UniProtKB/Swiss-Prot annotation:
Function statement: Catalyzes the transfer of a dimethylallyl group onto the adenine at position 37 in tRNAs that read codons beginning with uridine, leading to the formation of N6-(dimethylallyl)adenosine (i(6)A).
Assembly notes: Monomer.
Taxonomic source organism: Thermotoga maritima (strain ATCC 43589 / DSM 3109 / JCM 10099 / NBRC 100826 / MSB8)
GO biological process: tRNA modification
Residues that coordinate or bind substrate: T10, A11, V12, G13, K14, T15
Protein name, as recorded: tRNA dimethylallyltransferase
Site (Interaction with substrate tRNA): T99, R121
Length: 305
């Protein structure tokens, strides 16, 4: 038995395609999106609509509040529990989403062996406060491989990598390779040519604005959720907050959301290219109807192995 993980960049069309595919083969979707886990954040995370979620049962959406902590280790544990529940009911589970870190947690396993040390974390945060950028330089020197996988602005993961090194004397990138993988999964990636994908991203952002993204952010702030939360630094939310604080005008806000989403999509594609064994479908050149038929066949046949 092999379970499909269907990944790809944001706005490529994963949700619409996979809802139709899963509906026809009697499958349920396990979301693999690190932002759709948050309640109240619907428009900016492009969650499936209530109607779509009625057509196909979705798991791992709306599971925590925006101020709750969550990581890839927790996702792996919770989503595997959801997967087992789907299997018990005689259905086919299909993972769908663009969070490469979650795909890694499922396929390659995840290292979570060193307990957090608040003293070390406090020390590192203070060091960064005194000399911005110093932790990134330290990571590049101590663990170059981890530095290539951790975004320069991701202070939380940078601190975690340095914390592990300081506690164990070993690089987190080495320890992660020792994590136990899971051979029950296979990966499918949906993609499009850059020009088409970027056009779809721009249209999606325009639609989010029309649907009330600014009001959604205002509502979240009104509920008491801090702009400094990890959830509120999601692309779309961060730019709206800066706009509301008067850092730039409305048009600049829209421009930045589009630009940052395009950059994010490019990073997603690069991430999934690391899976040499993945099956890729380019929706710019392949007929979408034919791709759906191929997906149905591939998912069902692998599940039946």
């Amino acid at each position: 038995m092999k379970i499909a993980i269907v990944g790809g960049p944001t706005a490529v069309g994963k949700t619409d395609i996979m809802i139709e595919v899963c509906e026809e083969i009697g499958a349920e979707i396990i979301s693999m999106d690190s932002r759709q886990i948050y309640r109240y954040m619907d428009i900016g995370t492009a969650k499936p609509t209530p109607e779509q979620r009625k057509r196909v049962l979705h798991h791992m959406i709306d599971i925590i509040d925006p101020d709750e902590y969550y990581n890839a280790f927790m996702y792996r544990k919770d989503s595997l529990r959801a997967m087992e529940d789907v299997l018990r009911r005689g259905k086919i589970p299909v993972y769908v989403g663009g969070t490469g870190l979650y795909a890694d947690a499922l396929v390659r396993g995840i290292f979570e062996g060193v307990p957090a040390d608040e003293n070390i974390r406090k020390e590192l945060r203070e060091l960064e406060r005194r000399e911005p950028g110093i932790l990134r330089k330290m990571l590049e020197e101590l663990d170059p491989e981890a530095a290539t996988r951790i975004h320069p602005n991701d202070l939380k993961r940078t601190i975690r990598a340095l914390e592990v090194y300081m506690k164990t004397g070993r690089r987190i990138s080495e320890l992660q390779k020792e994590a136990k993988g899971d051979d029950r999964f296979f990966i499918i990636v949906l993609t499009r040519e850059r020009y088409e994908l970027y056009e779809r991203i721009n249209k999606r952002v325009d639609k989010m604005i029309e649907m009330g993204l600014v009001d959604e952010v205002k509502r979240l702030l009104g509920m008491g959720y801090s702009k400094d939360l990890n959830s509120m630094k999601t692309i779309g939310y961060k730019e709206v907050i800066d706009y509301l604080e008067g850092k730039y005008d409305f048009d600049k806000m829209v421009h930045l959301i589009k630009r940052n989403t395009r950059h994010f999509a490019r990073r997603q594609i690069i991430w999934f290219k690391r899976y040499k064994e993945a099956v890729w479908y380019n929706l710019t050149f392949e007929d979408v109807g034919e791709v759906k038929e191929k997906l149905k066949k591939l998912i069902v046949e692998n599940f039946s192995v």
